[in-house]
């Protein structure tokens, strides 16, 4: 089963990914935790460039994310899924649509086509959208990378993008209230993941 975590800056994706992986392992499931950008040697190099390097044009940024994704799917995600592991990925194609499409203003249909090319058509079975107002998420976040330093209106556009994506695919993208303590959010996530997991993956 392929699960992705999505959301704006400071929503707690990294924490929730770790808590979900721990829960899955306790329940006896083999799982792989990975992230975008990143997840491979090329991906980690691109991550440094994308998040901490000199400013890029929106198109160059988009193409680097696509290169990262193509390598990531081929070397990490698809092989893990092929042997029956649960894959939990911090960001995937929805982030590209939200950030480069809604945030940067690039053409959404062209981004979808590029995503399809990079992934070979692979889509998550479940996407957990951690929903938190941009103002709250930015106040929480301390990393200070290039995305977090964008102006508030950019993050509001990204947020509206995630809202639109969730509205368009309600069966795949499930809104999770990201307010409250990490354990409270983790409980909300597990209440969504557990029935989907039991339906998709045989009990170990």
From Swiss-Prot:
ATP binds at residues 7-14. Keywords: ATP-binding, Kinase, Nucleotide biosynthesis, Nucleotide-binding, Transferase. It catalyses: dTMP + ATP = dTDP + ADP. GO terms for cellular component: cytosol. Its EC number is 2.7.4.9. It holds the Pfam family Thymidylate_kin. One of its GO terms (biological process) is dTDP biosynthetic process. GO terms for molecular function: ATP binding; dTMP kinase activity. Phosphorylation of dTMP to form dTDP in both de novo and salvage pathways of dTTP synthesis. NCBIfam families: DTMP_kinase. This is Thymidylate kinase.
């Amino acid at each position: 089963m392929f699960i992705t975590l999505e959301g704006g800056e400071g929503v707690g994706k990294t924490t929730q990914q770790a808590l979900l992986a721990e829960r899955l392992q306790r329940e006896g499931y083999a799982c792989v935790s990975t992230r975008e950008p990143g997840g491979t040697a090329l991906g980690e190099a691109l991550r440094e460039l994308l998040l901490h390097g000199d400013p890029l044009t929106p198109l160059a940024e988009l193409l680097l994310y696509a290169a990262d994704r193509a390598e990531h799917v081929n070397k990490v995600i698809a092989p893990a899924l092929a042997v029956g592991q649960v894959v939990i990925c911090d960001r995937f194609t929805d982030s590209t649509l939200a950030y480069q499409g809604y945030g940067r203003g690039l053409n959404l249909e062209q981004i979808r086509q590029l995503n399809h090319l990079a992934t070979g058509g692979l889509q998550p079975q479940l996407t957990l959208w951690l929903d938190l107002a941009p103002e709250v998420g930015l106040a929480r976040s301390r990393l200070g990378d290039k995305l977090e330093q964008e102006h508030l209106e950019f993050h509001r556009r990204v947020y509206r993008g995630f809202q639109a994506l969730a509205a368009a695919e309600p069966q795949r993208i499930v809104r999770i209230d990201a307010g409250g303590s990490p354990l409270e959010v983790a409980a909300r996530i597990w209440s969504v993941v557990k029935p989907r997991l039991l339906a998709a993956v045989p009990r170990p």
